[in-house]
C-alpha cells in the first residue's frame, strides 16, 4: 500500500492549480479547461427578429383572413436576412422579410410566405396570425450579463462557437 501523506502529496502534485492561467486565442482553446466564467457581452438575438421568410405585419390587419377570405396588404419594403428598414408599417401595410431580419416598427407578427400569394407590390394573406406569433424577441436565446460557461469546464466546439459569437478573441485557460 501507499501511505496517506504520500498519496495526498502525489495527488496535489498532479492537480493543476486554478491560478496557473494563460490566455490563448479561441482557435487554440478547444479541449482546454476554461480558467474564467464566460459572460454574455450582448443579447442574442441582438434585436427582435423574424424566425422565417414571410411578411411582417400588424396582426389586427389580418383578422379573419383565410383562403376563402384573403386579405390584401400593400408591400412597402423588403428586408433581407440580418438587414433592417427605417420604414414603419401602418394600417393594411406589410414588409417582406427574410429569416433573421429585424422586425420593422409597427409590426407585431410575421406570416410565413407559404400562407400568402408571394406578392411583391401587394400580397394576399390566407391565414390569421396572432400577436407575437413567429416573432423572436431580443435576448430570447441569451441575455447580456448571463453566465454562459462556468470556470473549470472543458471547452468543446460548441463552447468555442458561443465564445466567438460574443466577440471574444482570447480566453483564459488553465495551463
Task: Report each predicted region and the residues it spans.
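Short, low-complexity N-terminal leaders and the immediately following helix N-cap/first helix
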Residues: 1-69
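Short, glycine/charged-enriched hinge/interface segments at domain edges or termini
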Residues: 55-175
Amino acid at each position: 500500500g501507499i501511505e496517506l501523506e504520500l498519496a495526498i502529496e502525489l495527488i496535489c502534485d498532479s492537480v493543476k492549480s486554478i491560478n496557473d492561467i494563460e490566455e490563448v486565442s479561441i482557435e487554440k482553446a478547444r479541449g482546454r479547461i476554461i480558467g474564467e466564467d464566460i459572460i454574455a457581452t450582448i443579447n442574442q438575438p441582438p434585436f427582435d427578429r423574424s424566425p422565417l421568410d414571410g411578411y411582417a405585419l400588424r396582426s389586427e390587419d389580418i383578422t379573419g383572413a383565410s383562403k376563402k377570405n384573403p386579405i390584401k396588404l400593400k408591400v412597402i419594403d423588403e428586408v433581407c436576412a440580418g438587414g433592417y428598414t427605417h420604414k414603419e408599417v401602418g394600417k393594411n401595410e406589410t414588409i417582406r422579410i427574410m429569416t433573421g431580419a429585424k422586425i420593422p416598427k409597427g409590426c407585431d407578427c410575421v406570416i410565413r410566405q407559404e400562407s400568402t400569394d408571394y406578392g411583391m407590390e401587394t400580397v394576399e394573406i390566407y391565414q390569421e396570425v396572432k400577436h407575437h406569433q413567429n416573432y423572436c424577441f431580443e435576448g430570447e436565446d441569451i441575455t447580456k450579463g448571463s453566465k454562459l460557461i462556468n470556470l473549470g469546464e472543458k471547452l468543446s466546439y460548441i463552447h468555442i462557437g458561443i465564445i466567438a459569437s460574443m466577440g471574444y478573441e482570447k480566453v483564459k485557460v488553465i495551463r
